[in-house]
Amino acid sequence: MVRLLDDPVPFLDHPDAEVRRLAISACVASGLTDESVAGVARLAGEDVDGAVRAMAAEALGGAGQRAVAVLDALRSDDDPRVHEAVATAYGELKHGEAVPWLIEMAAGDGDRASREAAVAALGAIGDGAALPVLLDLVADAPPQVRRRAVVALTVFDDSAVEPALRNAARDRNPSVREAAEMVVGRQPD
């Protein structure tokens, strides 16, 4: 284990998926280098274990623009955990060119975690093209997605945002209400 922490890159090729995930974490914790980014990117695209691919994809969010091409290719992965991780990485990178894909994922009927990650990424990026879908989602989506939309909307300076957040502060779901109340204050019933 000490060897993994000292030099995690060789462990990216370990036969045990758990060790590969630990190596990815150690690469991130020690700061992504060109060598570790190359290894993590390879795992993101080629590993047989979906959890490893997802963890590697999310780690690439800390690799800067050099990771964008890999993340773009991962959009076609069959594992929804990878889609969630790609969305998270795009948000960390504030990658504006991903906004159309993120909008599609946020508004789609995919798994909830991927939709949440896409909404969070749209908020992190702050592109005005996302505003209409975020306004729709804050009013009509699963509760976890509505809650994420509340937070995402806080970065937009648009006259439609405050009424949407005030409505969310009266949402039937307590987690959505709480998130909105933190932004606009408690609303009378």
Residue spans for each PLM region:
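Structural detector for internal amphipathic alpha-helices that build alpha-solenoid repeat scaffolds
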Residues: 1-3, 10, 18-33, 42, ...
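Short inter-helical turns and helix N-cap capping residues of alpha-solenoid HEAT/ARM repeat scaffolds
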Residues: 15-16, 48-49, 78-79, 110-111, ...
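Short, contiguous alpha-helical
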Residues: 39
